[in-house]
Amino acid sequence: MALLWALAVLSHLPLLDAQSPECANLMTVAPITNATMDLLSGKWFYIGSAFRNPEYNKSARAIQAAFFYLEPRHAEDKLITREYQTIEDKCVYNCSFIKIYRQNGTLSKVESDREHFVDLLLSKHFRTFMLAASWNGTKNVGVSFYADKPEVTQEQKKEFLDVIKCIGIQESEIIYTDEKKDACGPLEKQHEEERKKETEAS
């Protein structure tokens, strides 16, 4: 899945290590509170990503479009995820969860008996966020970008591009999704109708 995949990919990269005050400001990782989790609640779209590793880029190119829902569970320090991803013109659905490490400002998921960690970067625009790894000169740096709408404003995009520049990746290396290629609309609608019926019955 786009979100869970990015968590796994980015977790293989070194953690944040700012090289300049400007980049440090952009890449500040803050503790995660209940308010932070509430900000992440709702529907999000996977906008794009950039990775130096060719294998990761190949995987990113396979994702034509993706969106997901996050549901906070404060007491459990986790986010329930419902993710819809379009690959080869087909919809792939997955339900899982992401663990929250509040003090470190990190997210994690367990895959193949291994826990994968990434840093959460909340945007100053609030309705976008990024998952990021290091820009410390390794060949595997990377960032993924998410927004609450399938299209972002120029200001939101600029913040993403500034982070990309900080980690030493060219703008031409960014791989964007295309919401017009989404094939998950019908399944999402079906799930919404099922949840509505369950709510009415309870």
From Swiss-Prot:
| Protein name (database record) | Alpha-1-acid glycoprotein
- Glycosylation site list: 34, 57, 94, 104, 136
Q: In this UniProt entry, which cysteines form S-S bonds? A: 91-184
- State the UniProt keywords alphabetically: Acute phase, Disulfide bond, Glycoprotein, Secreted, Signal, Transport
Q: Where does the UniProt annotation locate this protein? A: Secreted
A Pfam family it matches: Lipocalin
> What family does the entry list?
Belongs to the calycin superfamily. Lipocalin family.
Instruction: Write the gene name.
Output: ORM1
Function text: Functions as a transport protein in the blood stream. Binds various ligands in the interior of its beta-barrel domain. Appears to function in modulating the activity of the immune system during the acute-phase reaction.
